[in-house]
Amino acid sequence: MNCAILVSGDVKYTRRLLDSAFFREIDGFAIAGMVASAPDAQALTRARNLHVPTFVVEEKLFPNGTSYGVALLNKLKDIDSDFVVADGMAPVPACVAKHFGGRLLRVKLNPVGQTMEITAYLSDAAGCVGEVLGEATAALESTDTQESFTRRVYDLAEGLIVDAVESCCGA
């Protein structure tokens, strides 16, 4: 499976996935490239360090969201992506969601009281939650700082992403 990772800033949920690809830990999985919406996205440096091809489709250069979406979709096609992981890019342009419906992996965070519900899912063609591939919950602990809680949430999300990709590769 040839996967592209979409980012808008830093890597949030795909550090472990990048490492898994680098060390070839998932059979049949390769990262075709990381595509960022801005040239200064910190995620690009991490990807380059792991020998992942990087690309920029700079959103601010386009007159509207539709033309940006078409350019992004064309880049994903150019690098032969057959699966996409959206890491912190929201919203994903409608034409990308439509083209990759059922093959666009996203993470949804839902705060509920003193917990954070984390869901990894395949987006449908309308860009909505489709098939749920994994769920986890992080409870706020009395010793947590904002940073430690956020890191724990991201760690859980990273695990869900890797598990979801493994599941999709095995399907």
Regions found by a protein language model. Give the residues of each.
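One-carbon transfer enzymes
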Residues: 1-171
